[in-house]
Amino acid sequence: MAAAEEEDGGPEGPNRERGGAGATFECNICLETAREAVVSVCGHLYCWPCLHQWLETRPERQECPVCKAGISREKVVPLYGRGSQKPQDPRLKTPPRPQGQRPAPESRGGFQPFGDTGGFHFSFGVGAFPFGFFTTVFNAHEPFRRGTGVDLGQGHPASSWQDSLFLFLAIFFFFWLLSI
């Protein structure tokens, strides 16, 4: 019966991952065969690139991903085994930093009643002259855009009827404020 267990990969069989000459160990982060294996003082095994990335992304809370014990570069031990081609300490080299990717800016097409500022903004004026309101209404922050026919995304030129309507409402509101 014991011979049958050994042939089919039972608890003591040659197909067990933890036993035999071809034993491999799994990283507790990526769950793959550990490359440049290191062991934490709490006994958990990791790939050094995986653990390095784990530590770099959480600099204020450096804890073991498995048991949440304290962990750092100094609290891991590199593993060396028979047939290891790299006898150097994997902690001394760090994986290369990933390349940055710049996403394309989002287009905010359509009607934008307060210019291209991304929304309405408030400014305080002195006395009866709220200068922030006038600069928002008359687009003083973009003096050269008016009348140039710049396309805002969906075929609406910058000097459309919507600008005139908004200007009329602003002037009406201003005179209403003066009459109060």
Swiss-Prot record:
SUPFAM superfamilies linked: RING/U-box
N-acetylalanine carried by residues: A2
Self-association and partners: Interacts with PXN. Interacts with Salmonella typhimurium sopA. Interacts with JKAMP. Interacts with STING1; the interaction of endogenous proteins is dependent on viral infection.
TM helices/strands, residue ranges: 118-138, 160-180
Topology with respect to the bilayer: Multi-pass membrane protein
Family that this chain belongs to: Belongs to the RNF5 family.
Modified residues (Phosphothreonine): T94
Reported function: Membrane-bound E3 ubiquitin-protein ligase that mediates ubiquitination of target proteins. May function together with E2 ubiquitin-conjugating enzymes UBE2D1/UBCH5A and UBE2D2/UBC4. Mediates ubiquitination of PXN/paxillin,thereby regulating cell motility and localization of PXN/paxillin. Catalyzes ubiquitination of Salmonella type III secreted protein sopA.
UniProt main location, coarse: membrane
Pathway annotation from the record: Protein modification; protein ubiquitination
Protein name as it appears in the record: E3 ubiquitin-protein ligase RNF5
Tissue-wise expression: Widely expressed.
One GO MF term: ubiquitin-like protein conjugating enzyme binding
InterPro entries referenced in this protein's UniProt entry, alphabetically: RNF5/RNF185-like, Znf_RING, Znf_RING/FYVE/PHD, Znf_RING_CS
Chemical reaction(s) catalysed: S-ubiquitinyl-[E2 ubiquitin-conjugating enzyme]-L-cysteine + [acceptor protein]-L-lysine = [E2 ubiquitin-conjugating enzyme]-L-cysteine + N(6)-ubiquitinyl-[acceptor protein]-L-lysine
Modified residues (Phosphoserine): S84, S107
CDD domains for the chain: RING-HC_RNF5
Gene that encodes the chain: RNF5
